[in-house]
Amino acid sequence: MPIDPLDVAILNALQVDGRASLRRVARTVGASVTTVSTRVRGLERLGVLQGFVPLLSVQRLAAMGRSPHCVALFVRPSSSAREGIERAARAVAREPAVCYLFQLAGTSELLALASTRSERETAALVRSLQDLTPVARVRTIPIHRVHKERPNHPVGPALAAVPELGA
């Protein structure tokens, strides 16, 4: 099922308010509730929509003395071959504290953003990552302050050739 302009409009509406009712999303995008419901289920089946979760404000939690310990982790795989990078990425992605995991362009290095309850938990996470066979090195940079946190992802134009997931 290709993603069309209506799907993009639905995704954008849900990124603005993931708790919006299907009726409100339908009004926003100019479609029927039935159509929006069908499209949302289709986007879930495709894995484009992976659930609806609350966004916690690190800034507000910090103001209440409950700030999570956020850290950027630069992970160097043991092998710079494609398979080695994929093995390292799969291993790092299994860690529950890792919120985001990216492969950086022009390098075999991975960038992980993680969130733990304390520096002690972060240190344990780093040790755990360093003990993974497909990981050669982990470099950490603690995040001092969060100025913006909003994981809005614009949906780009259709590509002529879509790469396969995991390829």
Per-region residue spans from a language model:
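A compositional/biophysical signature of low hydrophobicity enriched in polar/charged and small residues
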Residues: 1-167
